[in-house]
Amino acid sequence: MSDISKIDRNFHVESNLNLADVKFYDIQDEPFSLYGVFYENGLYRRMPEQIAKSVSPQVWQLHDNTAGGRVKFVTNSRYVAIRAIMPQIGKMPHFPLTGSAGFDLYVGRKEEYVKTFTPPFAITDGFESVIRFDSRAKREITINFPLYSAVSALYIGLEEDAFLKKAPGYVEEKPIVFYGSSITQGGCA
């Protein structure tokens, strides 16, 4: 089969950043705001390990899948790159890698979808990707974590002369606990 990305650029997966002016930041540092997951024993998790173990084997198995996790910040960079370290990749025959292992980028208070950081097909332990904008402008960025993969580290790459600021918090700061199936999550609807 020929490389369809040579015919249609929408099929191209950028895995070599080639960014001379990139500066990477660890999302555990200020000014990043993390929601929906927290860091424990080397992984981002949806709930503490001990609680997950005490609920059921199924909850234990899925508690380090990062569905619902997101990081927010404000920048004027003309691109946002990621470097994700992922010790477990959720590859399934009925589910695309963009959902199970990709990160989605949204812009603005209403979090309008821009594009997905698409993992390469041969992903084994993480990937790098970049999303470019047409111009330099102040943007509130939200990056959603993958649905069915584990993430041990995430670094955000921006132009080294771009500013990086804390994003405004959510209007309602109290967490909402919502339980549902994979259909509710959007995984297998």
Question: Could you describe each region identified by the protein language model?
Answer:
Residues 1-175:
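N-terminal secretory targeting modules
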Residues 173-189:
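Catalytic nucleophile-elbow at a beta strand-turn-alpha helix junction centered on a G-D-S/GDSL motif
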